[in-house]
Amino acid sequence: MENGSLFNASEIGDLVKAFSNSLAKAPSVTTANGLNFLPLEEEARNTYPVFHPVLDMIPRVTPEELGHEVGGLTATWKQILTPGGNVLPSVPEGSRNAYINIPTRTTSANYVTLGVDAAVTFESQSAGVGFNDNLGTANLAKLNVLLNLEERMSIFGNSGNASTGNNGFLLAVTNTPTLTLKTGGSIPGATNVSVFLVALTGWGVYNAQNFGANLTAPGIAQQISYTSADGNTVTLAGGTAKISLASNVVTATGGTLAVEVKVAAKPGTFGYAVYIDVTDSTTPLAANAYFAGVYTTSKFIISSIPAAVSGMTSQAASALGNVDYSANPATANTTGDFDGVTTWLAGSTGGLKPAYVVDLAGATFTSDGAGGVAELEAAISNQWNTYQVTPDAILISSDLVPAFQTAMQSSPSGSGAGTLWIRQGTPDNPAMGGSLIQEYKCKFSAFGLSKVLPIRNIPWLPSNTLLAPTFNNPYPAAGDSIPSNFRMVCREGYYGLKFPYISRVHSMGIYVEETLECYVPWAGILLTSVGDLGVA
């Protein structure tokens, strides 16, 4: 003991050294141990889109006869077409005119059942207590999924049943494309290029993005097949036409060329699956053509060869069956599609009274010099001059919003050119960028009054598409017998079911039985393959 200490100097040195060494080692507890407060918000957030503006524009009705609700397999109605086409008004003195003809047509639309199912295990429900109502989440999710799918069906559902009033169509064989070399690409020199095309309906474009992309070799899904909650096999057509014949072969030189693809469009086509062959120099083979993507205009540019084509890793054209899957009629394991708004218009082109269905082949909107869009003005004038009808709304795909707005706010060069300046009307007049076009004035109406058409962006409308339907009665003076041009006839409105327990799973579904009526299918405008601002 030194100076009254319990430890001598040597022992104190050893203690200090040992203590210092312990401080240099890793601490016992850090944030990596996970002993931290978890600031989890009190509920899960629904971070997915739900849009159904077209559904909201169409009235929903229950089928009735003499004031009583009725069922049946179809909604059927008679159309009285233009009477009196066989006479003129002048009659001889003291005589009479010929009897007028009154042509009619019978139209029907099959009821279909749409539905979505969901399941929640008992453990999931009990484990979510205090955080999230998992049953409630599943119920809301299936309703939202049904609304999104029903919206798409209302736009481009296709029964293919053209024999009952031109409601529905089949695309059959895709027309043969033609190729032309263009400058401005990066296709390697001495590359032989040919293509095969598959025309796609609205469902075809959607399915290529959502099912075809998940194939082992990405491409298009000609059929969608899965097992239902009750063990049945559901098989639906993928919205695809038969594949085209091969195009001509072009040979790139110099490494700075691109290939322009053109094909004659068929009504009801919203896109094309493209298969590129860079192997054959004379006679292209489907076995050497590989999926290169989906284009939504009938004229487009291939500026480079995708890696999936040169690497032969995407779907080969030879993998496709030579079958037309462009329509979804009722079959043994599905009630099929009802015909959507665009299908009623496209289907009418096969009859005596066609709607205005025009493919612009990649051409962009142009200004008419008076605040209007020339292509839309031509369509509206045609509808009025031919049938004395006008649209009730302008519905455009998301990609066309800038192009449509630019055309409205631009003027062509020359004496009629003009510039419009708009600024915010506040005392200091700050500059504000951006603009929003919400309405479009129609030059025609049934009563000679000003008619203003709302402009709506429709998220589920296929790209490069403008739809201007007539939703209301276009002929109110003709006896007012048309309640609305389009009506959703609901044999059974939305109903939810919770199924008996066969395991410790809550099983439930939501369904609706309905069909879409159209009394005047020639009243409407459908412009496809409209070039956006990025299309030359």
Model-derived regions, located:
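Sequence/fold signature of self-assembling virion shell proteins
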Residues: 2-51, 126, 133, 308-389, ...
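Stable alpha-helical elements in mature extracytoplasmic
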Residues: 135-138, 146, 376
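Sec-exported extracytoplasmic/periplasmic mature domains
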Residues: 143-151
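Disordered, low-complexity "stalk" and linker segments at domain junctions of extracellular
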Residues: 160-352
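Hydrophobic alpha-helical segments involved in membrane association or supramolecular assembly
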Residues: 47, 51-77, 140, 144, ...
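Assembly/oligomerization interface modules of large self-assembling protein complexes
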Residues: 33-117
